[in-house]
């Protein structure tokens, strides 16, 4: 499973290829990759959305679109490839996004464990799975925050 530094590296490498581009088409070749909404709704909602930014939260990749956030968890070994529009789909490419520059941005996952969630932008950090995550390593962690977290635990010492 990619750890946080690997996920951050993936994001860093994706930024020049996708930020500022618009999704003009989407094809889903393995429905189980799409966790929410249904694959049909996912495709309908994501087409026409512009990719405004990309970041991480935990091990999730968060792609901010016009109206939605696309959350992607790579799980065991998911990865992305850029291809020319119309290039043959390879065996383990399960989701394809066509961008407005005629580039095909593809999710590749041999084990098919990865997941994608399309969430209304205003709910990105309010609903599962992101709402269940703790602070990032670079967030300010205060003494009061730690005190509060420790005292809310109901675990035996």
Report each predicted region and the residues it spans.
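Extended, highly charged segments
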Residues: 1-57, 62-66, 88, 148
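Phosphate/anion-contacting hairpin/loop surfaces
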Residues: 70-157
